[in-house]
Amino acid sequence: DLLREFLGAPDDQIDCPTEAQRELFGPTRRRVPEMLDLKNPVLLGPVQNQEHHMNGVVARRDNFNEPILGFLEQCYDEFAQLTGRRYGLIQEYRTEDADTVFVSLGCAAENVEAACDYLREQRGAKVGSIHINVIRPFPEAAVINALRGKKNVIVLERTDEGMSGDNPLGRDIRTTLSKGQEASRYGGTLPSITLDQTPRIFRGSYGLGSRDFRPEHTLGAYEFAVGGTVRKDGKSAADGETYFTLG
């Protein structure tokens, strides 16, 4: 009943929320548009010339992609009203006074949060965690606001793209902070962050080949970032190294 109330029925008629949708569907549309009508079996887009394909890609970005984050935030608010459980584009854990913040996806965040509790209680370390709930579109404004003024950010990912400059999430974090620096110089819609407010980015890979990811791995990541340990090749954060593998 809760899911039915929150999601509605596929054939409900709802108001179109954007001008682009109103132009496409009219003032209202089916909650889940029918992609195939057996009574009118037509197909759109299997073959397009270069001009029309490019126009479609640009129109999709401007008219349909950009409003998505706002829709998601509205959905999180409605879900919180129904259940009392509030999610968001990102979830912050003990980040208010943290100088080192972990960033992760999925169930890894639970291990990271447990390690943050241990580091605070046993070592007095000011650490926190950010759990990214939405990866596309990437929540750039929320990430900039959450990381502004931190000393270190440790991005943990269950992958290793060895021939790329960064793994995917680390690349998104680095790009986001760079765009925030541009906003501080040139303005724009994103929140601004100065170079002095930008944390140093550390990047770690864990759990490759389904190897276990344990809280002690998070402790090791923290020790590397603050200069308390070195990699097996002897290199450390003091040498300018920011990548490591856990486990």
Where would I find each of the regions flagged by the language model?
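Short acidic, glycine/serine/threonine-rich loops at helix termini
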Residues: 2-12, 113-115, 140-142, 164-168, ...
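Conformationally flexible catalytic loops at phosphate/diphosphate-handling active centers
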Residues: 1-91
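Redox- and metal-dependent alpha/beta enzyme cores, enriched for Fe-S-associated oxidoreductases
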Residues: 89, 96-125, 138-145
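Short helix-loop-beta junction
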Residues: 74, 78, 82, 114-129
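Peripheral docking tails and interdomain loops at the edges
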Residues: 154-247
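Short beta->alpha junction loops
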Residues: 130-136, 203-207
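Solvent-exposed alpha-helices and their adjacent loops that cap or buttress functional pockets
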Residues: 6, 13-17, 92-97, 145-147, ...
